[in-house]
């Protein structure tokens, strides 16, 4: 353990700092870092280098090359820079490289050097040029702030939703500030800048002069400033060699340190961690690195070569041509276990486990000491926590073995923390591998989340590793393997050196029916890459027609989209395609397409019936569908025409169509309707009243109700209304009028073709039993019983039923007998039944 703490450096009495190597860089740089624009993404992100050929002391002879590397120095991309002079580079939270040019244009590149998009910081910037720029991160996303040649600031807090803000002018500012940075306070981005001995804070509304509390006297200039990773703290380097550290609000001073160096540093960044004991700032010069905090002494390191500092959530990454290191405050659990002569529970447990492996009795002594103090649970937790903060797998294993050893002597220690730490460390060790090059710490990993880490592996096209992690952690398929495979497929369609057939087959073999994977999304990506045929092949694997059709329409494959919509059976989908086709094709081609798709044609006809009647007529004409054309003209005659002449003309057209369709019945019926309309018009002119649009029967009934019996009879003869129907019409009309005398005359005019039972029924319906009895006696024998029962003459009905010896009639009469009034009649029927059975 003594050897293990050899690289620990105390800062004051409360904290230790250590620096260890992450990778030995093998990136074969052709330029010194000082000659390059450098950008390194946080959370173990990639490194971008662009040799600066626009420096005045080094005239450019060739175009510069933009190189992108992993944190381990593995090359990811290299491209010849063909655009304008670049002022600054920076990485967004999505690991997109932002290149801020002198003309105010910001070019956005992917991790593999693929151009994504560009945007401008405004016309004023274009006119005045960019002097300096900062890329910063907020809870809203990644932002860009620039300083123009007119010494004005412009910023956007989120490049994904670009909204430019021109900051207020600084009074009397005639030259570029000596240093400046972006502060994020209360969800608002501010600019803090130094002009000589003065500090100014710019927000969207005003420019305010600010003074750091407790600043040492004699300051004539601020040479460097740094804001912490979380934007909570600020450090200022003055020309007197003092470093002031305080809150970012400039309301509270934390400490001040005199480094006795007045030369401006190359970089200054914060080095702290969550729940840090000692907040510290790391300052770098050409060959010196200094860690300062609230202590009279500092920690100093010699830099053998040009180095670059990358602030992280819990420390600072330092890389040069040959190495990549991590400097951080030793976590509390590690300090408790490993510091010299530590008697912490975790330290004793680690020693106990080592002695146990040696089969030494000291293991029992250490263990008993921990148990006697009641600190075994704390010891296990310390070892688990410390294992998470260790970078070397061997030390992780030692600590986890100690934790596992201690757990054996605890009855109810929850296993979740141990299991999760083992899983997390296995994931971290996998991504820290040199060939992967993502040197995440445990704290960074927890802040980043597993989903974001998987996204970053996908971004690096490390699909197998991402899938292995998903399977190892048993993530739900939709969040894990399915999502990774979908990304892989979207990348696969961009490989233009492979045939469409092979790509489609490979994707289907790999994905199959994996839940959560949308073939339509993959096909859309293929179409976006200009591979239309591949997109169509991929859509064949998409089971949801609702996802197939919109993309097919977008690809101008409307006829195929129509076929797919019809196959789905979704009428709404078919209508969507039809309306698209209607707007896309000329009228003739559209109708021809419909003729080849009967279902679509039928649906379109239904649509036209409600929306486009003239189009419907054209469809019938084109198909020579005279039957439907006749029906169309009949509907049109009533829907569109109010004049009787126009209506008759439309009906005549319909009759002609029916004759062409060889439907003589429909043609004759239409001609009869024309005659009826003309007659109704004449009746209205001669008799008054409302006759138009009545049916033939209603017309006859209306005439009878109006007392025009002769005209009604003449109408019946003209239209060959059968006698039975005419008698029913007249019977009903006279009963409605309650003209019983005329009804009796009508019944005696000749023998009724409908019999006399209807007369009985109609009279009873009008509650006139007296009139009903008149007709009951005239009812024929086969309906006599029913008529007598209708008028309530149960006794006579019984006599008739007995006389007819009809069992059904006897049962009918018996069902109408009531015990109080018809008892004798019921007995009479029962005796008749008994006599009939004896015979």
UniProtKB/Swiss-Prot annotation:
Gene3D superfamilies noted in UniProt: Vps16, C-terminal region
Keywords tagged on the record: Autophagy, Cytoplasmic vesicle, Disease variant, Dystonia, Endosome, Lysosome, Membrane, Nitration, Protein transport, Transport
Region annotation Interaction with VPS33A: where it falls in the sequence: 642-736
GO BP annotations listed: autophagosome maturation; endosomal transport; endosomal vesicle fusion; endosome to lysosome transport; intracellular protein transport; regulation of SNARE complex assembly; vacuole fusion, non-autophagic
Tissues of expression: Ubiquitous.
GO MF terms held by the record: actin binding; actin filament binding
Compartment list: Late endosome membrane; Lysosome membrane; Early endosome; Cytoplasmic vesicle, Clathrin-coated vesicle
Topology within the bilayer: Peripheral membrane protein
N-terminal signal peptide: none
Annotated InterPro entries: VPS16, Vps16_C, Vps16_C_sf, Vps16_N
Pfam families according to UniProt: Vps16_C (PF04840), Vps16_N (PF04841)
Superkingdom of origin organism: Eukaryota
Principal place of residence: membrane
Residues recorded as bearing 3'-nitrotyrosine in the entry: 4
GO cellular component entries: autophagosome; axon; clathrin-coated vesicle; CORVET complex; early endosome; endosome; endosome membrane; HOPS complex
Record disease entry: Dystonia 30: A form of dystonia, a disorder defined by the presence of sustained involuntary muscle contraction, often leading to abnormal postures. DYT30 is characterized by early onset and predominantly cervical, bulbar, orofacial, and upper limb involvement. Some patients have a more complex phenotype with neurocognitive impairment, including mild intellectual disability or psychiatric manifestations. Loss of ambulation is observed in some cases. DYT30 inheritance is autosomal dominant with incomplete penetrance.
Assigned protein family: Belongs to the VPS16 family.
Function: Plays a role in vesicle-mediated protein trafficking to lysosomal compartments including the endocytic membrane transport and autophagic pathways. Believed to act as a core component of the putative HOPS and CORVET endosomal tethering complexes which are proposed to be involved in the Rab5-to-Rab7 endosome conversion probably implicating MON1A/B, and via binding SNAREs and SNARE complexes to mediate tethering and docking events during SNARE-mediated membrane fusion.
Subunit structure as annotated in this protein's UniProt entry: Core component of at least two putative endosomal tethering complexes, the homotypic fusion and vacuole protein sorting (HOPS) complex and the class C core vacuole/endosome tethering (CORVET) complex. Their common core is composed of the class C Vps proteins VPS11, VPS16, VPS18 and VPS33A, which in HOPS further associates with VPS39 and VPS41 and in CORVET with VPS8 and TGFBRAP1. Interacts with RAB5C. Interacts with STX17, MON1B. Associates with adapter protein complex 3 (AP-3) and clathrin:AP-3 complexes.
Protein name: Vacuolar protein sorting-associated protein 16 homolog
Organism: Homo sapiens (Human)
Originating gene: VPS16
């Amino acid at each position: 353990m003594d050897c293990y703490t050899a690289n620990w450096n105390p800062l004051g009495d409360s904290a230790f700092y250590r620096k260890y190597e992450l990778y030995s860089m093998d990136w074969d740089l052709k330029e010194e870092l000082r000659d390059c624009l450098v950008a390194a993404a946080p959370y173990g992100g990639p490194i971008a280098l662009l040799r600066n050929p626009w420096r005045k002391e080094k005239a450019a002879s060739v175009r510069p090359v933009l190189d992108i590397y992993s944190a381990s120095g593995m090359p990811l991309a290299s491209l010849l820079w063909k655009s304008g002079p670049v002022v600054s580079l920076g990485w967004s939270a999505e690991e997109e490289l932002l290149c801020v040019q002198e003309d105010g244009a910001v070019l956005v590149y992917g991790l593999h050097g693929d151009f994504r998009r560009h945007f401008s910081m405004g016309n004023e910037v274009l006119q005045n040029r960019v002097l300096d720029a900062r890329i910063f991160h907020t809870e809203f996303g990644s932002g860009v702030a620039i300083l123009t040649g007119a010494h004005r600031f412009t910023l956007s807090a989120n490049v994904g939703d670009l909204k430019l803000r021109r900051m207020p002018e600084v009074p009397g500012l005639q030259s570029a500030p000596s240093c400046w940075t972006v502060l994020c306070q209360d969800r608002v981005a501010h600019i803090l800048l130094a002009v000589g001995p003065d500090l100014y804070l710019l927000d969207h509304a005003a420019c305010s002069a600010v003074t750091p509390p407790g600043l040492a006297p004699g300051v004539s200039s601020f040479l460097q400033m740094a804001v912490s990773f979380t934007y909570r703290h600020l450090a200022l380097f003055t020309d007197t060699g003092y470093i002031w550290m305080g809150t970012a609000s400039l309301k509270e001073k934390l400490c001040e340190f005199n480094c006795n160096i007045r030369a401006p540093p190359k970089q200054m960044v914060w080095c702290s961690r969550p729940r840090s004991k000692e907040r510290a700032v790391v300052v770098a010069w050409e060959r010196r690195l200094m860690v300062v905090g609230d202590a009279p002494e500092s920690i100093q390191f010699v830099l053998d070569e040009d180095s670059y500092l990358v602030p992280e959530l819990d420390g600072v990454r330092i890389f040069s041509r040959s190495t990549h290191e991590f400097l951080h405050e030793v976590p509390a659990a590690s300090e408790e276990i490993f510091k010299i002569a530590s008697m912490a529970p975790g330290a004793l447990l680690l020693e106990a486990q080592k002695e146990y492996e040696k089969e030494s009795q000291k293991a029992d002594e250490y263990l008993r000491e921990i148990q006697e103090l009641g600190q075994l649970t704390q010891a296990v937790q310390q070892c688990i926590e410390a294992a998470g903060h260790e970078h070397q797998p061997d030390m992780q294993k030692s600590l986890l073995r100690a934790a596992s050893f201690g757990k054996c002597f605890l009855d109810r220690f929850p296993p979740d923390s141990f299991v999760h730490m083992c899983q997390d460390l296995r994931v971290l060790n996998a991504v820290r591998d040199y060939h992967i090059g993502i040197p995440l710490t445990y704290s960074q990993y927890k802040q980043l989340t597993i989903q974001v880490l998987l996204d970053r592996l996908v971004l690096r096209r490390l699909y197998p590793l991402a899938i292995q992690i998903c399977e190892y952690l048993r993530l739900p398929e939709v969040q894990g393997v399915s999502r990774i495979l979908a990304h892989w497929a979207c990348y696969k369609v961009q490989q233009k050196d492979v045939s469409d057939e092979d790509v489609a087959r490979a994707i289907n073999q790999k994905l199959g029916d994996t839940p959560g994977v949308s073939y339509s999304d993959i096909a859309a990506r293929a179409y976006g890459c200009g591979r239309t045929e591949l997109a169509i092949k991929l859509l064949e694997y998409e089971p949801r027609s609702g996802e197939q059709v919109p993309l097919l329409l977008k690809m101008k494959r409307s006829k195929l989209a129509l076929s797919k919509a019809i196959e789905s059976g979704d009428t709404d989908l078919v209508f969507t395609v039809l309306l698209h086709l209607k707007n896309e094709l000329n009228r003739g081609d559209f109708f021809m397409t419909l003729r080849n798709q009967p279902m679509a044609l039928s649906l379109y006809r239904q649509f036209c019936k409600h929306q486009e009647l003239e189009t419907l007529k054209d469809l019938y004409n084109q198909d020579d569908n005279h039957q439907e054309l006749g029906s169309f003209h009949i509907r049109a005659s009533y829907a569109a025409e109010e004049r009787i002449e126009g209506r008759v003309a439309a009906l005549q057209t319909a009759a002609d169509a029916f004759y062409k369709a060889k439907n003589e019945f429909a043609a004759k019926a239409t001609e009869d309707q024309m005659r009826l309309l003309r007659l109704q018009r004449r009746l209205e002119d001669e008799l008054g009243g409302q006759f138009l649009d009545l049916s033939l029967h209603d017309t006859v009934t209306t005439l009878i109700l109006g007392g025009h019996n002769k005209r009604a009879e003449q109408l019946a003869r003209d239209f060959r209304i059968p006698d039975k129907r005419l008698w029913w019409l007249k019977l009903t009309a006279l009963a409605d009028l309650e003209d019983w005398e005329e009804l009796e005359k009508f019944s005696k005019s000749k023998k009724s073709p409908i019999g006399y039972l209807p007369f009985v029924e109609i009279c009873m319906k009008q509650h006139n039993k007296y009139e009903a009895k008149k007709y009951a006696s005239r009812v024929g024998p086969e309906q006599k019983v029913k008529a007598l029962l209708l008028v309530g003459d149960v006794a006579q009905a019984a006599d008739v039923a007995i006389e007819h010896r009809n069992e059904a009639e006897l049962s009918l009469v018996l069902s109408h007998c009531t015990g109080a009034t018809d008892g004798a009649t019921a007995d009479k029927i029962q005796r008749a039944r008994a006599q009939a059975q004896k015979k």
